[in-house]
Swiss-Prot record:
Pfam families: FAD_binding_6, NAD_binding_1. Its EC number is 1.6.2.2. It comes from Kluyveromyces lactis (strain ATCC 8585 / CBS 2359 / DSM 70799 / NBRC 1267 / NRRL Y-1140 / WM37) (Yeast). Pathway: Protein modification; peptidyl-diphthamide biosynthesis. Its cofactor is FAD. This is NADH-cytochrome b5 reductase 1. The gene is CBR1. It catalyses: 2 Fe(III)-[cytochrome b5] + NADH = 2 Fe(II)-[cytochrome b5] + NAD(+) + H(+); 2 Fe(3+)-[Dph3] + NADH = 2 Fe(2+)-[Dph3] + NAD(+) + H(+). It is a single-pass membrane protein.
Amino acid sequence: MVPGKFIFTATFVLLCTIIAVVLEYQSKKDKPVLDKEKLQEFPLVAKTVLTHNTAIYRFGLPKSTQVLGLPIGQHISVQANINGKDILRSYTPTSLDSDAVGHFELLIKSYEKGNISKHFAQLNIGDKIKVRGPKGFYHYQPNMNEEIGMIAGGTGIAPMYQIMKSIFANDSDKTKVSLVYGNQTEEDILLKKELDAFVERKPDQFKVYYLLDKAPEAWTGGVGYITVDTMKERLPAPAEGVQLLVCGPPPMVSSIKRNAVTLGYEKAKPISKMGDQIFVF
């Protein structure tokens, strides 16, 4: 064989081999676990108690290398059989695919008269829940807004925390975030350590203001309901590149919608869409 032809043939074979290896690797990469149509079971692998009725529940994925596959800002449906009836509820994981490989986490507050939430409190390690998704009309993208105002009540902090964590972890995302977070008591404030860390490490980008219904004497935050004045003082004014996100108990959400219109925001639609100036989870 002519030396030149040999070199060409060897190079061609090597190139084909490399391409074959790359294609095989790509085909074997773990795909996101979530399925919009199919319910799948995931076992409880850890439980971190935050308050007397709230905990972070960690569920394992089939393989330690897999991710849930949840777009930031969306949620999942959880199904449980309660008294012979299959009941579905929506929850936003507090974990991101980027920091939760092999598992996902849910922040759940259990109520005595709740259905699914009470079911969570009774789970033991190894017990399974049924999940499908993703669901929702919100899909956060870096720098999609210049500023985001957030209002959360109770466990309504979950989608806000997920988005804030994504922004915090991405140095190229310059979105500014102002959060007003209401609770009944100081003990009820969830993920406070994590929220305060965002502010401490990136004070020019993150601002958090806490309100309590029942504040202790030494409390330095806000007291009472989230009023028009509170929103005007603590959140960005309505403008191009500004979006307001809301998640919490229905009475709070209704009040916030009215207050927002008073401040000049567009009226919230019955079903929120991605580009709305006010998006209600």
